[in-house]
């Protein structure tokens, strides 16, 4: 929180991963920062849940695919038990990983980072900088579970996105740009926009290839507006 940061106190981070090597790498990354410290580690979700029920952490770095209890199951328990520790999910760079990452946001995760493919990437600057940036953002937020509302699939009415008063919004667009924490924030905004919005909406979100498509598909399911991943030659229409 802000008081801890202003007093130069270190934020306590819990690291959860079934890979001993990745736990070690993530601990080294966190401990290299003068505002963070890796307080505890767990090798599966069940261990993590037990710790989170009894101890306080400023953020959790959580793997998805683990034995006994996976990351999505942990998030589901945290949500049901109103444990609001900010969670940063580590996701594989695959289609399945993209689905799991977007699902984790709906279950209350703050954001996600993609898992390194090998030890060279794990110890590289890109993974280190990305992980530290997201963890720093996570520990500074006020923990809320915006995804605790029921996520429903919206049935779009035929012609619902056609603007009857075309002149009113013909020269306007709504532009939204987001970075760390952005995918979760978009899930709290886009589904609440009306189908009769008088201007097209453009979203700019830095994500790995494939993840933007998955996010767009999920937002489309939840929203009255039609949402799609942009493609070359697309034309913005009211």
Residue ranges and their predicted role:
Residues 5-238:
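Strand-loop microenvironment adjacent to phosphate/nucleotide-handling motifs in alpha/beta enzyme folds
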Residues 1-3:
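Acidic, Ala/Val/Gly-enriched low-complexity intrinsically disordered segments
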């Amino acid at each position: 929180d802000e008081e801890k940061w202003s007093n130069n106190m270190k934020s306590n981070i819990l690291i959860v991963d079934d890979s001993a090597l990745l736990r070690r790498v993530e601990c080294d990354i966190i401990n290299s920062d003068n505002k963070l410290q890796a307080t505890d580690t767990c090798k599966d979700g069940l261990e993590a849940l037990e710790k989170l029920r009894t101890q306080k952490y400023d953020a959790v770095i959580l793997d998805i695919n683990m034995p006994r209890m996976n990351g999505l199951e942990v998030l589901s328990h945290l949500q049901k038990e109103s444990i609001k520790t900010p969670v940063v999910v580590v996701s594989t760079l695959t289609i399945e990983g993209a689905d799991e990452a977007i699902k984790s946001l709906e279950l209350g995760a703050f954001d996600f980072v993609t898992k390194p493919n090998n030890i060279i990437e794990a110890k590289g600057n890109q993974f280190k900088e990305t992980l530290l940036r997201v963890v720093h953002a996570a520990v500074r937020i006020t923990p809320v579970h915006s995804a605790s509302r029921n996520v429903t699939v919206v049935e779009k009415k035929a012609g619902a996105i056609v603007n009857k008063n075309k002149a009113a919004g013909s020269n306007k667009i709504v532009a939204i740009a987001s970075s760390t924490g952005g995918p979760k924030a978009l899930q709290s905004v886009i589904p609440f926009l009306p189908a009769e919005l008088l201007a097209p909406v453009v979203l700019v979100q830095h994500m790995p290839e494939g993840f933007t498509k998955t996010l767009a598909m999920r937002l489309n399911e939840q929203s009255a507006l039609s949402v799609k991943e942009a493609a070359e030659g697309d034309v913005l229409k009211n």
